[in-house]
Design a protein with these regions (language model features):
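Active-site neighborhoods and metal-handling regions in enzymes and metal-associated proteins
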Residues: 1-403
Length: 403
């Protein structure tokens, strides 16, 4: 793992101008809301450190690099409230940065000023996309230097996953599969007046019991007509026995996300009408996955998905004219996946090592049916690999889970 992190840093620093300093900030916990701390993903990508109020600093001069990390001093009083902070030994083991270059925040400003002056630095790189007050203060304080945004450079690197990153995504998907099976078990209990939030809680509890400390995003558990709202936020409705239940869910492992959607019959059997629509979406899901290989674009996949869905809906008399598909399909078929659920990207063709989703859907309000089927796909040298193929999506396989 540490070697992977070192390799990422080396690739990043190759793209930075000489006579430059890079400053990345991990972010700060908000004490007013007491929300969980969410580490800056670019900081984590290059350090493997998730601790708040930490700085990662790189110096590049004459094509030689120095790396520093600044952390909070360990404080026995604060430790009683919030637990132990990382020590320099911990940081060295996790990040691979030399022990002598692991410093404390009380000397951060002094050290930065020394590095700038001693090395006649001309450029400062900051992650300006993540609009932290701390970064804005640094930008203002050192405005006499050339300021560059390193967000796009890191984004381009993050798009290509190394083996360690891919394994993290696979672990997250495997845990999500366990959560999906828990959803089925919960539905099999056949309790009257079951609420969407009961399924929501069952999934979240299951994945937290299986080695992940993170839910990748707020689970979308939507029954009946609620499945027609893409980011349905309020899972409080009663689930009716003849409904379909759309479950857009994902765990994260070591901050790497999975993103899976399955649409299942509450009573264990698809009706004929539900089957008709489900089979169109499933065929589209499989068709788009077949097309994936290096050299194509996500925009191409979207065009093909929309064309396929409109043609199928015409043939099945769901619409009368092709343009009417916009009423029933109104989102993109794919996005990048990684440290963020909707991961960073620059407009480019697909390359080996990228991970994307494939998630066609149809949302027919008048029939109270919303169906989406989403898989996570790794781009390989010769094509693709579906990382979520173990999660049932064929009608017969889903119905078999209820037996």
């Amino acid at each position: 793992m540490v070697n992977n992190i070192k390799t990422r840093r080396a690739k990043f620093l190759e793209k930075i101008n000489n006579n430059s300093i890079v400053i990345l900030f991990s972010g700060k916990h908000n004490p007013n809301t007491n929300d969980d701390f969410f580490v800056n993903r670019n900081f984590f990508y290059l350090s493997n450190i998730s601790q708040e109020n930490s700085y990662l600093v790189f110096l590049k001069k004459n094509n030689k690099f120095e790396e520093y990390i600044f952390i909070d001093k360990q404080d026995k009083k604060l430790e009683k409230w919030f637990g132990k902070k990382l020590s320099s030994i911990d940081v060295n083991a996790i990040s691979g940065i030399k022990k002598n270059n692991i410093l404390t925040n009380d000397i951060f400003e002094k050290k930065i000023n020394f590095l700038l002056q001693e090395n006649k630095i001309e450029n400062i790189y900051l992650d300006l996309h993540n609009n932290e007050n701390v970064i804005n203060e640094i930008k203002t304080k050192y405005s006499n230097y050339k300021i560059f945004d390193c967000y796009a450079i890191i984004s381009e690197l993050r798009m290509i996953k190394d083996d360690c990153e891919i394994n993290n995504v696979i672990k997250a998907i495997n845990i999500t599969n366990l959560g999906f099976k828990r959803i089925i078990r919960e539905l099999k209990l056949k309790k009257n007046n079951k609420k969407e939030f009961e399924i929501f809680n069952a999934f979240n509890n299951e994945i937290l019991n299986h080695g992940t400390h993170e839910i990748a995003f707020k689970s979308i558990i939507a029954s009946g007509i609620n499945a027609c709202y893409l980011h349905y936020p309020t899972p409080y409705a009663t689930i009716l026995k003849n409904d379909l239940l759309l479950c857009d869910v994902g765990s994260a492992f070591n901050h790497y996300a999975s993103d899976i959607t399955r649409t299942i019959p509450v009573n264990g059997k698809f009706s004929q009408q539900q089957k008709k629509i489900y089979e169109i979406v499933l065929a589209c899901n499989k068709k788009i996955i077949e097309l994936i290989k290096p050299g194509i674009t996500i925009e191409y996949l979207q065009k093909k998905a929309k064309s396929f869905l409109s043609q199928q809906c015409l043939e099945k008399k769901i619409i009368k004219k092709k343009f009417e598909i916009n009423k029933y399909y109104y989102h993109n078929v794919s996005h990048y996946l990684g440290l963020d659920v909707h991961d960073v990207c620059v407009k480019t063709k697909l390359k080996p090592g990228m991970v994307i989703t494939v998630e066609p859907g149809l949302y027919i309000k008048e029939k109270k049916i919303g169906i989406r089927i989403e898989d996570d796909i790794l781009i390989t040298k010769n094509g693709h690999k579906c990382l979520s193929s173990m999660i049932a999506k064929e009608i017969k396989d889903i119905e078999k889970l209820y037996l």
